């Protein structure tokens, strides 16, 4: 089973999920024979095997979301029209529903002097703060960073673990200034959620200028200052 729009030569494995509602089934056989496609006990299509021994079938009407147990039979081209026993079923799931919108990411500072959560609108001296959150296990979280007034850019991704948690840290320093982080969730079928609400932080790792004593005021007494 090949999802439309996928990389040529790639195929869905049994039990996998796709967002493609018109997946293509293909195979090989005896030229002139007819391949019958079944979902459970219901015939949903057929295709004739061409002169090179190949066949393919794509639904003309999009399939609704759900689980499909696909099997094949072959009908001989002879006048008897004998039909083979069905093949071993292959189960696929069609899922076009996007995941729920993720919650706003949490930002954590791990550089002294002040460590811990960085709230929306606050500053941090951590050039590689940790972002974390929760989601559906095995969904992929994509992190977007809008620097200043620029456009949001995808800067990293991480898979939600079996406990529903995720955590991501930039591989390199993210740079001084304002960063607004959002996140999306992508499920196994490739459906991507709308972005989360954003959290804006300001990275400031520059120490203040060294203070200079410019004057000492005091009453003079023999040339000294009391």
Question: Each PLM stretch: what is its role?
Answer:
Residues 72-74, 183:
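Hydrophobic/tyrosine-rich beta-strand signature of extracellular beta-sandwich/beta-rich modules
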């Amino acid at each position: 089973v090949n999802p439309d729009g996928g990389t040529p030569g790639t195929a869905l494995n049994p039990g996998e999920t796709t967002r493609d509602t018109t997946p293509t089934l293909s195979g090989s056989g005896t030229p002139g024979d007819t391949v019958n496609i079944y979902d459970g006990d219901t015939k949903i299509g057929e295709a004739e095997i061409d002169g090179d021994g190949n066949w393919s079938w794509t639904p003309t009407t999009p399939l609704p979301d759900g689980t499909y147990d696909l099997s094949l039979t072959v009908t001989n081209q002879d006048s008897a029209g004998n039909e083979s026993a069905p093949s071993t079923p292959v189960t696929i799931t069609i899922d076009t529903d996007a995941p729920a919108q993720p919650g706003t990411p949490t930002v954590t500072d791990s550089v002294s002097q002040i460590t811990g959560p960085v709230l929306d609108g606050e500053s941090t001296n951590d050039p590689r703060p940790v972002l974390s959150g929760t989601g559906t296990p095995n969904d992929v979280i994509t992190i977007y960073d809008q620097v200043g007034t620029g456009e949001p850019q995808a800067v990293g991704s991480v898979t939600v673990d079996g406990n529903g948690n995720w955590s991501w840290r930039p591989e390199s320093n993210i740079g001084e200034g304002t960063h607004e982080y959002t996140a999306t969730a992508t499920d196994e079928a490739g459906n991507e959620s709308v972005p989360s609400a954003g959290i804006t932080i300001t990275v400031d790792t520059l120490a203040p200028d060294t203070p200079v004593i410019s004057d000492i005021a005091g009453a003079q007494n023999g040339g000294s200052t009391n």
